[in-house]
Amino acid sequence: MSQILTKALLELADDHLILGHRLSEWCGHAPLLEEDLALPNMGLDLIGTARSLYTYACQVENKNKSEDDFAFLRNEREYVNCLLVERPNFNFAHTILKQLYFSVFMELYWSAALNSDDEMLVGIAGKAKKEMAYHLSLIHI
């Protein structure tokens, strides 16, 4: 059971980490000042969620690893993120559409996770759901 949970946590964490870094690429390059500030902040939210998920995965796996081991000490083939989040930022519209897809899906996911029996996951989900709702409001949904 712990291997399945660890794998699921890593999938979620990798999605959030990679997309967080992709969004931060817009710092100083977005078409308007509002977006120039909002996109990197959304990226920071995602990276914060990734940190929580990596930390929880370390606790579940119980092999004396740190969140940094999962986030930075793996080769590129060991990441288990979905392909959507790693796609390059071709242009601003593409980035916003990618963020829309991810945020809608994750808001639904985190809403469902709030009903979990896993208290740690519920805690992460509570914060992440609020952030996803905020991200959706920033992209005017």
Q: What kind of region is each of these model predictions?
A:
Residues 1-10, 73-98, 116:
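Acidic/His metal-coordination segments adjacent to aromatic residues that form catalytic metal sites
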Residues 19-41, 105-122:
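Helix-loop segments that flank and shape redox-cofactor active sites
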Residues 15-23, 49, 53, 102-109, ...:
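Amphipathic, well-ordered alpha-helical segments in soluble domains
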Residues 4-11, 30-49, 95, 120-134:
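Alpha-helical scaffold segments that form or flank carboxylate-/histidine-based iron centers
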Residues 3-26:
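Short, Lys/Arg-rich amphipathic segments at extreme N-termini
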Residues 41, 47-65:
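Carboxylate/His-rich catalytic cores and anion/metal-binding grooves
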Residues 84-137:
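Internal, conserved structured core segments that host functional sites
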